[in-house]
């Protein structure tokens, strides 16, 4: 007997446990700013239409996402935050992270990379956020 399987299902949670824990820390320190999770890189930066490689540049960024983006009251992105677990040590992830860092640098959007931990010190994360934003502000 053939049983049709559904090709898709709704995930129970948007964030992993590590991401949820870190999100709560961010919530406690960003004040009136808005935090967005799992934002597509192509929604943060655009590929210049005049550039010869526009299509391939867009194709590259459309499948990448940033763990968290903090926006101001106008919903303008002010900083990207990546939560780096052990997978970021793999050669393919190291290359991907280097590319993402460079893309965000070109687009003038600062990025803070935070290693995954069991617990986070909100004051330390706040200090890191401010230090990362300092050259921009």
Please report, for each region that a protein language model flagged, where it lies by residue:
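N-terminal, charge-rich interaction modules
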Residues: 15-19, 23
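Active-site metal-binding core of divalent-cation-utilizing nuclease and nuclease-like domains
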Residues: 14, 37-78
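Membrane-proximal, solvent-exposed terminal domains/tails of membrane-associated proteins
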Residues: 135-137
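Nuclease-adjacent, charged terminal/linker segments that flank catalytic cores
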Residues: 1-10, 14
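Short secondary-structure junctions
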Residues: 29-35
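Basic, amphipathic alpha-helical patches used to engage nucleic acids or provide basic targeting signals
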Residues: 64-127
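Short low-complexity, flexible loop/linker segments enriched in glycine and/or proline
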Residues: 50-52, 126-131
């Amino acid at each position: 007997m053939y049983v049709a399987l559904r090709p898709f299902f709704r995930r129970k949670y948007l964030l992993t446990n590590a991401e949820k824990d870190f999100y709560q820390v961010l919530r406690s320190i960003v004040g009136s700013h808005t935090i967005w999770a799992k934002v597509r890189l192509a929604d943060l930066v655009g590929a210049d239409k005049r550039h010869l490689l526009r299509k391939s540049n867009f194709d590259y960024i459309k499948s990448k996402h940033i763990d968290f983006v903090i926006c101001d009251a106008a919903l303008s992105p002010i900083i990207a935050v990546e939560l780096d677990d052990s997978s970021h040590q793999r050669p393919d992830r190291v290359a991907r992270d280097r590319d993402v860092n460079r893309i965000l640098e070109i687009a003038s959007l600062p990025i803070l990379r935070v290693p995954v931990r069991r617990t986070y010190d909100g004051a330390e994360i706040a200090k890191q956020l401010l230090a990362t934003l300092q050259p921009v502000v």
